[in-house]
Amino acid sequence: MKITQFGTQPYDRESFDRIRDTYGFDICYHRSHLNANNVALAQGSDAVCIFVNDTADAGTIRQLAGMGVKLIALRCAGFNNVDLNAAARYGIPVVRVPAYSPHAVAEHAVALMLALNRKIHRAYWRTRDGNFSLHGLMGFDMYGKTAGIVGTGRIARELIRILKGFGMEVVANDLFPDPQYAAEAGIAYVPLDELYARADIVSLHCPLTDRTRYMIGDAAISRMKPGVILINTGRGQLIHTEALIDGLKEKKIGAAGLDVYEEEAGYFYEDTSDRIMDDDVLARLLSFNNVIVTSHQGFFTREAVDNIARTTMQNIKDFSECRRLENEVRAEPENAVGQL
């Protein structure tokens, strides 16, 4: 079975090459991201393997189907970059890696919280320049504070477990609340308005759907507690970035930790240090000393990268052997908020 992999980074190739002989697949790697202009690279392939910044829209899928591609294998959990309705029309199953490492992303979210709260990033640069002043570096005790978690899927539940260890109170919101989980974890499901009003830290862990796109905008920010720390390790378009910038300028948002950005394609996963940044919104965001942006690296641990490769290859093997596709995703009228 021939597989064309798009958006390949060196670590992808290493992890897939370690196990490719076990599965016996022929893999062709490309650094470029899949889109309608380079889809011809998949000519002669049985499957394409894509990541978060590849584009499998209706036009691209139509071309893939015309080439005889039979499977789209995502090596990530999210699937908002795939037109599932188009895939269904052309009879191309879509599989994903639903839980490669919820620990990795949850731990990264906590790292962002701690760094922003205790100003670790600012202290690092100060001491390197010989400035050992504590002025402007005061944080707050996490103990006794309230965390608001939007979405209570695998990653969020791991995060909640960690935050409870700090002695934090946790309130959550999910389209489909789980009362049994809430009782076991010692959390409370509350309406979003109440979550925004109570939380000292708000962390987003929901997929991108029509319901959640730009859920954090001017209206939501206006209802948040002054000085709130906002964390997003989910999807970039959950936050309207210009509204976030306004909230930061008005000091309504105390700090923001972002592992995703709504227009991250073309920047994230690439070294752009030798060229002028033409995204004025991202440039403005990076100018704040109370904002930390990481390049969608929340998943990036040895364990997670290995799990991604193994699960992706097993998904493809199941398809090639006509087995039930346990990790298939299909078009639905509305996807649940708590999937991540």
Segment roles from a protein language model:
Residues 1-95, 217:
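An N-terminal-biased, well-structured beta-alpha scaffold segment characteristic
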Residues 40-41, 194-195, 220, 284-285:
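Structural alpha-helical scaffold elements that stabilize or flank donor/cofactor-binding regions
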Residues 52-53, 200, 206-208, 234-235, ...:
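Short glycine-/small-residue-rich Rossmann-like dinucleotide-binding loops
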Residues 66-71, 90-92, 168, 226-228, ...:
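A short helix->loop->beta-strand "cap" motif at the edges of active sites that frequently abuts
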Residues 90-92, 98-146, 158-161, 165:
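Phosphate-binding beta-alpha-beta segment of Rossmann-like dinucleotide-binding domains, i.e.
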Residues 135-226:
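Rossmann-like dinucleotide/phosphate-binding beta-alpha-beta segment
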Residues 227, 236-340:
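Rossmann-like dinucleotide-binding domain for NAD(H)/NADP(H)
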Residues 231:
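Glycine-rich nucleotide-phosphate-binding loops and adjacent flexible coil segments
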